Amino acid sequence: LILAATVWLVNEPESNTYFGITSFLYVPVGSYDRNDTLNLGENRWKHTLQAGYITGLTSNISLDLVGDVTFFGKNDELGASKATLEQDPLYQLQGFLRYNVTPQWDLRTGISHTFGGETQINDINQDNDLATTKMTIGTAWFANPGLQLIANYGSDLSVENGFKEQHRLNFRILK
């Protein structure tokens, strides 16, 4: 379960300038059994604080800049030994350019860098800080004012301590 709310500190549609802060609270409601290898839940709370800035560079081109930090609660029932899992904050910086072909349709490209998030098990550092840089190109279309369809292709440019995605295709429907 993810609870989210945004506070708009700047909301100026006439100049296409926006600045908002969003808080995401991840509630541990999935099933979790420390003896299972795979669990749907993490048995811990998470909180992400995200700041996003959008500005129109021209009448058809927008720049989106987003930064966020995720804080993790601890899981004190990790594995059969009931170890304690703790995690350092995880940071992400994103930048996107969007070109509005029409008011309903845009083309977009972006870059993202995620870093941090080292874990500790029973206070022993796991030396697993993440550092991932990825690129995305895509398109979005408002089929009607309440329905947006998004398609993005992406690839990881560099990965430290994780799996590298050569190709990724994402489809989103927002209503």
Model regions: which residues?
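Short loop/turn motifs that connect adjacent beta-strands in outer-membrane beta-barrel proteins
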Residues: 10-19, 59-61, 104, 146
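Outer membrane beta-barrel transmembrane domains
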Residues: 77, 82-175
